[in-house]
């Protein structure tokens, strides 16, 4: 009996050690996403019937003075805002019966609004996820600054791509693929996502500029949360003495600026990853689903609250970007319909939307099944 209780309630138990950290991170990210939809909808004069964290039967809730039902539902793996006139939680316009709405509700219904209001409301969810990531990074930069090193090579691994390309200790990176380099981390950021690509480097050597080419090879590393990650590397390193390791501190505005830059880098790396993944150049095990996220949440929580919040930032931008994929019922799929409507001056036909919703739903479910299979069996 005691062993059973420890399994679920001990500090390293399934409940306290894994489920609670996972639900904490996921709930905050989902709440911010749905709050983005809700707030912009309110600003646009759109009425909301329900704001739910989770799906399925309601566990608890209340109705506010605007008639919106705020609730916590039984299945805590997501959430939704149901607007006036919605037939489902996905805000699909297919099957909407406007004749059943009162005149007042028709004015506040989602699907009767101008296309720009609908697009703004839909885009707000992913946008708020990105804003959450920027906000978290801003706080971390303000509190802890950033550890940097000069882009100087202290050593070249024998037989590595860098050795074959002619890199030498003492070389200073000036640019990679035309992008200016100011820190050693800049080189790592660019190279890590370009395994197998021939990259152009410019280094400063004895006061002269030298152009080199190298093809990063895949190396497997273990990140701070214990995940096996595959990255591109050319086989150079720096040291504290050569790289002049130091910490830069930032003021409030500088922290926000650095957070925006860091978030932009993550968006760029994510886009590059999926382009390479689509043509079979990335490892499928780099994609994970709820089981992997729960495992990461557990490991992050065991290392401290700061780690859990950093994971929240990464999950938030991941969910934001995923929702911008141009597939219904994701937000990006809605935005495609609104873009077509804005161009042609009339909505996409109900029949066409129904077809795309079914195709999109199957693709989204297939992707979810794929990452879950990775979690449980393949990786």
From Swiss-Prot:
The chain crosses the membrane at residues 39-61, 122-144, 305-327, 355-377. One of its GO terms (cellular component) is plasma membrane. NCBIfam families: RIP metalloprotease RseP. This is Putative zinc metalloprotease BR1156/BS1330_I1152. It comes from the Bacteria. Its cofactor is Zn(2+). One of its GO terms (molecular function) is metalloendopeptidase activity. The keyword Manganese does not apply. Gene3D superfamilies: 2.30.42.10. InterPro entries: PDZ, PDZ_6, PDZ_sf, Pept_M50_Zn, Peptidase_M50. The active site is at 34. Its EC number is 3.4.24.-. It is found in: Cell inner membrane. Belongs to the peptidase M50B family. Zn(2+) binds at residues 33, 37. It comes from Brucella suis biovar 1 (strain 1330). Keywords: Cell inner membrane, Cell membrane, Hydrolase, Membrane, Metal-binding, Metalloprotease, Protease, Transmembrane, Transmembrane helix, Zinc.
């Amino acid at each position: 009996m005691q062993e059973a209780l420890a399994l679920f309630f001990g500090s390293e138990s399934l409940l306290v050690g894994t489920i609670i950290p996972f639900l904490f991170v996921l709930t905050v990210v989902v709440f911010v996403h749905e709050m983005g939809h809700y707030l912009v909808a309110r600003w646009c004069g759109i009425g909301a019937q329900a704001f739910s964290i989770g799906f399925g039967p309601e566990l608890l809730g209340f109705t506010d003075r605007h008639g919106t039902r705020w609730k916590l539902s039984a299945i805590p793996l997501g959430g939704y805002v149901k607007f006036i006139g919605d037939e489902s939680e996905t805000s699909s316009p297919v099957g909407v019966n406007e004749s059943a709405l009162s005149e007042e509700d028709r004015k506040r219904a989602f699907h009767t609004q101008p296309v720009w209001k609908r697009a703004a409301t839909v885009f707000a969810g992913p946008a708020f996820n990105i804003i959450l990531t920027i906000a978290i990074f801003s706080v971390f930069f303000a509190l802890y600054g950033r550890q940097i090193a000069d882009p100087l090579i202290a050593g070249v691994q024998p037989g590595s791509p860098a050795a074959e390309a002619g890199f030498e200790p003492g070389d200073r990176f000036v640019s990679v693929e035309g992008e200016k380099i100011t820190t050693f981390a800049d080189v790592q950021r660019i190279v890590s996502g370009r395994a197998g690509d021939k990259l152009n480097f410019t280094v400063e050597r004895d006061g002269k500029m030298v152009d080199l080419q190298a093809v990063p090879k895949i190396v497997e590393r273990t990140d701070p949360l214990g995940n096996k990650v595959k990255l591109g590397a050319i086989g150079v390193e720096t040291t504290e003495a050569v790289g002049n390791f130091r910490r830069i501190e930032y003021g409030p505005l500088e922290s926000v600026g650095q957070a925006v830059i860091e978030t932009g880098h993550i968006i760029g790396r994510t886009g590059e990853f999926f382009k390479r993944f689509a043509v079979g150049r990335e490892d499928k095990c780099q994609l994970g689903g709820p089981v992997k996220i729960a495992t990461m949440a557990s490991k992050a929580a065991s290392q401290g609250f700061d780690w859990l919040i950093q994971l929240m930032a990464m999950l938030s931008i991941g969910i934001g970007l995923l929702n911008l994929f141009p597939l219904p019922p994701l937000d990006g799929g809605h935005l495609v319909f609104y873009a077509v409507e804005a161009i042609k001056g009339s909505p996409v036909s109900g029949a066409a939307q129904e077809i795309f919703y079914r195709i999109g739903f199957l693709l989204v479910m297939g992707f979810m099944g794929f990452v879950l299979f990775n979690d449980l069996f393949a990786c």
